[in-house]
Amino acid sequence: MPVERMRMRPWLEEQINSNTIPGLKWINKEKKIFQIPWMHAARHGWDVEKDAPLFRNWAIHTGKYQSGVDKPDPKTWKANFRCAMNSLPDIEEVKDKSIKKGNNAFRVYRMLPLSERPSKKGKKTKSEKDDKFKQIKQEPVESSFGINGLNDVTSDYFLSSSIKNEVDSTVNIVVVGQPHLDGSSEEQVIVANPPDVCQVVEVTTESDEQPLSMSQLYPLQISPVSSYAESETTDSVPSDEENAEGRLHWQKKNIEGKQYLSNLGMRNTSHMLPSMATFVANKPDLQVTIKEESCPLPYNSSWPPFPDIPLPQVVSTASTSSSRPDRETRASVIKKTSDITQSRVKSC
């Protein structure tokens, strides 16, 4: 059997009364107030024999240290002593009288009499724990559900309605709270064993006011088209007359017994490029040559000259009789067009 050792409070009283440890003494013996030297080990002048004998004696008393066998560890001795002091219910520290810094640091403690000791909390029986658990379990159920099993928000919504129709989904019982549309009296059905839970369904007629939809609350708004967008649209989109005129040139062709519609060679280039026609009409000194390519090439600065093919059409708005050379590249036409446009803009 393990040897019973003395508890910490009587052991401390014995150490104080022995007067063998420097700095450990009574401040007020009647009130059981005493001080313990508590100098930090990192301070200059700290000594094991002078500043840590109380902690070493407690380690020997608890069997954590044996002189000549174990290696001295003052830090662990002090930590174990502090934990033991804090765990005692009948000893408390007087913090306003303690000095924890400096070479003469110490802590002041007071031994509480029996009347001032805190009473131990008794353990609760199993029946008390079960009753408390049931009470905690029932509280959220009662607070979150109403009579019909609906939460408070839903029940408030249904109570605010003027007329309700209660429908039981299990036994098909209908209790109508208003007369029928033909003016007949109210019909009531009595059942011997009505169910406990009923589903509440709201039924509305065509005469009832329907809630406003999102489109009625927020009408659709279309911002006006800017002048820039209008001018761009008129230049790029052909009119209805131009589309109708373009559709008149469709011809039927029969290839290998199959019918096809074709307008090759019949379409007017002014309808194909309405934006170009508008662009050319405002420039009297501009002449644009349109050519068809069998194999389009990528747009770059090194365009080869076009082969000698007859020009399909020449669009000109000027009355001048000047002629252009047949071999004129597209890059030169675009460059000239940009030069003319820049000159007209600067002159304006």
From Swiss-Prot:
Principal location listed in the UniProt entry: nucleus
GO molecular function ontology, one term from the record = RNA polymerase II cis-regulatory region sequence-specific DNA binding
Q: Spell out which residues are annotated as carrying N6-acetyllysine.
A: 75, 78
DNA-binding region, residues: 5-113
> Record's Gene Ontology CC terms?
nucleus
InterPro entries the UniProt entry points to:
Interferon_reg_fac_CS (IPR019817), Interferon_reg_fact_DNA-bd_dom (IPR001346), IRF1/IRF2 (IPR017431), WH-like_DNA-bd_sf (IPR036388), WH_DNA-bd_sf (IPR036390)
Keywords attached to this Swiss-Prot or TrEMBL record, sorted alphabetically, are: Acetylation, Activator, DNA-binding, Isopeptide bond, Nucleus, Repressor, Transcription, Transcription regulation, Ubl conjugation
User: What's one GO BP annotation on this UniProt entry?
Assistant: immune system process
Bias kind Basic and acidic residues: ranges? 125-137
The question of whether Transcription is a record keyword is answered with yes
Give residues for the crosslink Glycyl lysine isopeptide (Lys-Gly) (interchain with G-Cter in SUMO).
137, 164, 291
SMART domains under this entry?
Answer: IRF
Q: Which Pfam families match?
A: IRF
Annotated region (Disordered), positions in chain: 117-137, 311-348
Q: What does this protein do?
A: Specifically binds to the upstream regulatory region of type I IFN and IFN-inducible MHC class I genes (the interferon consensus sequence (ICS)) and represses those genes. Also acts as an activator for several genes including H4 and IL7. Constitutively binds to the ISRE promoter to activate IL7. Involved in cell cycle regulation through binding the site II (HiNF-M) promoter region of H4 and activating transcription during cell growth. Antagonizes IRF1 transcriptional activation.
Question: Which family does the record claim for this protein?
Answer: Belongs to the IRF family.
Q: Indicate what this protein is called per its UniProt record.
A: Interferon regulatory factor 2
Per the UniProt entry, what species is this protein from, by scientific name?
Gallus gallus
This protein's encoding gene = IRF2
